[in-house]
Amino acid sequence: MDVDRLQEALKDFEKRGKKEASSELDQFLCHVAKTGETVVQWPQFKEYFVFKLEKVMDDFRSSAPDQRGSPNPNVEYIPFDEMKQRILKIVTGFNGTPFTIQRLCELLTDPRRNYTGTDKFLRGVEKNVMVVSCVYPSSEKNSSTSLNRMNGVMFPSNSQSYTDRSNVNGPGTPRPVNRPKFSLSSPMTTNGLPDSMENNESDLQQKEKSQSDSVASEDESQATTPKNKHSAEDSAETEEHEVKRLKFDTEEEEAACANPDASSEVSTEMAEEAESASASADKDKESCQSAQAADEESLMTPSESTEADSGERDSETVSVTEESSEESHQMEESEQSETACSLNSEEQNSAAAAASTVGTDTSEEEHLGTFGVKSTETLTLSPMENSEEATDAPEEPMDQD
């Protein structure tokens, strides 16, 4: 539709003194009823729209003046003139094109298509004019889209559409979530309110996109975290064991540093044990020596008896054997004293070197004691043999005599 011709026709209608219908402007209303798009602003065709609305209501009443039957008790009865003035007042109060402009143009171009009674027609018109949202003409847009609006509902089409809505007589209606935004070629206000809110919607869409991206990344991170849950727990357990071990080592070191007296006491106790072990070893040696002496005495008794028997034979040989036995006894006693002294020195050194091995030392001493006893027995036996040999030796010359 030619916008320039439409604007000229609207200007001519305003200049006329007597308001009459125009075929060109009626075609414009039919175009809006079919497509739902207005190519001019609301203030430009507002006057002709109000004129056409009033004329259609009057013509509808003239064709059906009286209501048939009794009025509906569930519906409030409003006189025609009062309803007419109410509708005209609402329409003249609009500062922008109402989003129901397509349905209103359908009622103006073909009023008897859906209504037969005047009161029902007026109620239908009232329902479509009692709106607060508005649309902008497509001529004010920088580009067109594939969206169209019919009776406030958006649907795809190949024609230009009015996608923006602003507040006319109250708060705006809810907006779709993903709706393309277009900037106006010239700043415009509706009902005294600036249009800055409409221009800021692109920023809001960008924020919503960033928020959705962040939510998606969080979901991905949450999906990957359960996979690494067990490995994280294992590492945490190993770290706890290492910390406990380090704490135990540090506690032992602190206890050793804090109790130096206890360590010194332990050393003194060990020294005392070593001394007591050495004293017990000395006592054991003395007892061994006394036992050895008793064994020697017991062994000497048979030797003396043999000497007494030999003394009966010859007194001279007995004296010789006694002297030899005494000499042998002295030599044996000197040898035993030397061995005892050497054993005592060795035992003292071993007791001072290791106090903890007292038991082993005592066993060694017992072994040595038994060895000494055996040695003394052998020694005592050897003199007896010598004495017998000595007794046999003097007998030979006596036989010769």
UniProtKB/Swiss-Prot annotation:
It comes from the Eukaryota. Residues 386-401 have a biased composition (Acidic residues). InterPro entries: PPP4R2. Residues 139-401 are annotated as: Disordered. GO terms for cellular component: protein phosphatase 4 complex. Pfam families: PPP4R2. GO terms for molecular function: protein phosphatase regulator activity. Residues 139-149, 156-170, 183-203, 339-349, 373-385 have a biased composition (Polar residues). Belongs to the PPP4R2 family. Serine/threonine-protein phosphatase 4 (PP4) occurs in different assemblies of the catalytic and one or more regulatory subunits. Regulatory subunit of serine/threonine-protein phosphatase 4 (PP4). This is Serine/threonine-protein phosphatase 4 regulatory subunit 2. It comes from Xenopus tropicalis (Western clawed frog). The gene is ppp4r2.
